[in-house]
């Protein structure tokens, strides 16, 4: 049990969660219980709690106690209507999140959302694939929709009536207009607009199910607002019946003005209550590229465990901008360590002599390799050193709608050939497949393109690192497949929001990352049980095996070369990245800030102990075993850019494949030669002066395998 000064409203909002408090009765007798609370989310509604004392609910009135809306940063006192008899001594009081008064409304709304989404999918099938990028869409075309869906007007009318009834139910429950579910009335307006011109319905699916402001998605957003029961408890009073309570003023950290002070306070040395400010120069300094909630949680954990065990004081600061670290280093004002950096920053800093080579510490590979994938270190390697450690990781996996694939008679694809085979069925039903290539219109990063090269045995760099590898047959095969999936098989080129497309069913399957997983877990209750994840589709090899190489790195940690406390910094880094600390940190985050704060650790052992569904953990860990990262190089930016430009030119502008790849090769090789000359690998005549090692991580892994590790 962890002692928390006050509970944040977001930390305890999911059905079934409980908060426990110890309360002490000074003598036997009848006591009244009051709460100083803040409920800032449900305008015109209540958040509900069932109250237990010593494991039991003493009387019915303590079930589903409503805490009315207070406003943001505004507190009120609420006294339970009936007193409770308590014996002298300590008692355990529990508040369980519940929403029983709204369950009927919630279930009705869930049914409506699913019916609207199912109707949207059926309409797409009727309409067919005339909505892709290459199709000439006739928005003036009208449909005799009643011939295909005779009851569509009745459906629209029934949904409108049911949604209005749900709104009125919630109004009756709260005793006032439920402004927090005002989206329900916007949903009704959308449905009524569709009913006015039924022949245009297939061309206006954005009003029904396909857009973030559609009827289905507005109603689904309301589901979350009903389901979540945010409530902050500042303190609990145990008192006599007529006792006057203190006025419910906001606490010291409430209110806008004090909120600003608290924000500024997070940058001060006083943030570190464990530090001896008189010996500030002796403290280990750490900059973190994370929001304040993450920093504060780590600060507390460090004080409780690391400093207590080692005696090393640690000062934390929120990093204003990781791009400014170079400037800080030039003035000697950089910290000893940085956490939460973009995964490629350590190598970039190493090229400027700013980072410590972690291989200088004899045990680094032993403890790191035991709990992390050493391939994650590839973008942090430079020449013969490793200058950062992977901290958090993405997981790119295949997301799929079980309900839709079943209805189409499709199975989960294992290879890209399987994906190609399913595309005609998806197209016939006006659906598509997502790849990260479609999620960023302007730039295709290594994370989006690398999987296709690596699965085919290709690479961005030549074996010696002095040229691009675009002329290699394996690399060309990967590049061609990456292009033909769009040119020949019609994958959608532009899906700016895969989550919304997946939710509506217009893109019921695709490769995406941790962010999508989190959105589905916490923001799409209507899809519970309707979706799942699988391994990324792979490329079948000559021996029948399937390669599934894909990127996974997210953030990294590093030690600065001008630090005077390298040993202390390394000791902290080793503690911070250990499975025990990572798991404890993940738990503390969710305890303090709620289940939405899922820590995407890169530690395999820690992830295995986290609260992901068991089947999902198995998929994530297996996909991680295929992690393959693009090496960072003095000229890596040009290779990333040229592959991106080539894809855009070939797929969207129709340029010939080989001619455009040849152009990318020339541009890349010219820039590689210029950068390697700048860094002293080539002389002014282009002659090699020294080798460039691009195989360090492979060599380290091979050596460990030979040693039986």
What are these regions (language model features)?
Residues 261-280, 343-397, 420, 448, ...:
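Hinge/lid segment of periplasmic solute-binding proteins
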Residues 534-538, 587-650, 681-708:
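Long, aromatic- and glycine/proline-rich binding clefts that accommodate carbohydrate-like moieties
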Residues 27, 524-597, 624-632:
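Extracytoplasmic/periplasmic substrate-recognition and gating elements
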Residues 464-495, 536-539:
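Glycine-centered hinge/linker elements that transmit conformational signals in sensory
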Residues 169-186, 190, 196-211, 551, ...:
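C-terminal capping/gating helix-and-loop segments adjacent to ligand/active sites or protein-protein/ligand interfaces
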Residues 382-391, 396, 420-468, 474-475, ...:
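Extracytoplasmic/periplasmic solute-binding protein
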Residues 1-237:
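Extracytoplasmic
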Residues 304-372, 403-414, 505-509, 522-526, ...:
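Extracytoplasmic "Venus flytrap"/periplasmic binding protein-like
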């Amino acid at each position: 049990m962890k002692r928390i000064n006050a509970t944040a409203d977001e930390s305890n909002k999911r059905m079934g969660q409980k908060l426990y408090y110890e309360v002490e009765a000074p003598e036997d007798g009848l006591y009244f219980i009051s709460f100083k609370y803040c409920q800032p989310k449900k305008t015109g509604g209540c958040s509900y709690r069932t109250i237990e004392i010593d494991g039991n609910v003493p009387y019915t009135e303590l079930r589903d106690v409503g805490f009315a809306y207070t406003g943001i940063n505004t507190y009120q006192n609420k006294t339970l209507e009936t007193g409770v008899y308590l014996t002298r001594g300590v008692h355990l009081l529990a508040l369980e999140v519940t929403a029983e008064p709204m369950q009927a409304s919630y279930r009705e709304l869930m049914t409506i959302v699913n019916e609207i989404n199912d109707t949207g999918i059926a309409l797409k099938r009727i309409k067919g694939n005339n909505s892709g990028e290459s199709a000439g869409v006739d928005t003036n075309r009208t449909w005799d929709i009643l011939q295909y869906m005779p009851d569509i007007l009745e459906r629209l009318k029934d949904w409108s009536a049911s949604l209005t009834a749900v709104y009125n139910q919630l109004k009756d429950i709260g005793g006032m207009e439920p402004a927090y579910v005002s989206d329900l009335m916007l949903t009704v307006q959308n449905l009524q607009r569709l009913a006015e011109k039924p022949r245009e319905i297939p061309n206006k699916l954005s009003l029904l199910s396909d857009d973030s402001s559609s009827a289905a998605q507005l109603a689904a957003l309301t589901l979350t607002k009903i389901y979540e029961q945010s409530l902050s408890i500042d303190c609990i009073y145990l008192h006599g019946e007529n006792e006057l309570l203190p006025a419910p003023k906001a606490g010291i950290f409430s209110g806008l003005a004090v909120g600003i002070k608290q924000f500024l306070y997070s940058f001060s040395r006083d943030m570190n209550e464990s530090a001896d400010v008189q010996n500030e120069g002796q403290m280990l300094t750490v900059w973190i590229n994370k929001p304040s909630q993450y920093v504060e949680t780590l600060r507390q954990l460090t004080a409780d465990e690391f400093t207590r065990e080692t005696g090393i004081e640690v000062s934390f600061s929120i990093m204003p901008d990781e791009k400014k670290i170079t400037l800080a280093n030039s003035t000697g004002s950089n910290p000893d360590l940085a956490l939460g950096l973009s995964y490629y920053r350590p190598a970039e800093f190493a090229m400027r002599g700013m980072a410590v080579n972690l291989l200088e510490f004899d045990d680094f590979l032993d403890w790191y390799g035991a709990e992390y994938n050493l391939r994650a270190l590839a973008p942090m390697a430079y020449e013969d050193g490793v200058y950062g450690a992977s901290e958090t990781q993405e997981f790119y996996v295949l997301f799929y709608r079980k309900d839709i694939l079943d209805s189409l008679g499709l199975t989960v694809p294992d290879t890209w050939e399987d994906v190609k085979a399913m595309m005609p069925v998806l197209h016939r039903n006006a659906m598509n497949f997502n790849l990260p290539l479609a999620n960023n219109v302007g730039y295709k990063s290594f994370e989006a393109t690398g999987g296709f090269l690596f699965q085919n045995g290709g690479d961005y760099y030549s074996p010696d690192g002095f040229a691009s590898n675009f002329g290699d047959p394996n690399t060309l095969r990967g590049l061609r497949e990456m292009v033909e999936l769009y040119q020949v098989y019609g994958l959608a080129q532009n899906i700016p929001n895969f989550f919304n497309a997946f939710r509506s069913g217009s893109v019921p399957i695709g490769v995406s990352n941790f962010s999508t997983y989190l959105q589905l877990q916490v923001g799409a209750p209507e899809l519970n049980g309707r979706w799942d994840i699988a391994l990324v589709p792979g490329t079948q090899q000559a021996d029948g095996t399937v390669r599934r190489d894909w990127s996974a790195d997210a953030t990294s940690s590093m030690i600065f070369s001008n630090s005077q406390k390298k040993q202390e910094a390394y000791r902290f880094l080793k503690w911070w990245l250990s499975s025990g600390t990572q798991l404890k940190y993940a738990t503390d985050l969710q305890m303090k800030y709620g289940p939405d704060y899922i820590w995407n650790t890169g530690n395999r052992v820690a992830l295995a102990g986290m609260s992901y569904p068991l089947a999902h953990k198995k998929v994530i860990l297996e996909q991680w075993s295929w992690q393959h990262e693009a090496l960072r190089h003095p000229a890596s930016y040009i290779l990333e850019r040229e592959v991106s430009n080539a894809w855009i030119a070939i797929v969207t502008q129709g340029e010939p494949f080989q001619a455009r790849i040849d152009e990318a090769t020339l541009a890349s090789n010219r820039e590689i030669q210029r950068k390697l000359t700048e860094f002293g690998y080539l002389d002014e005549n282009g002659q090699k002066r020294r080798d460039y090692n691009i195989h360090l991580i492979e060599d380290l892994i091979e050596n460990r395998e030979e040693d039986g590790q």
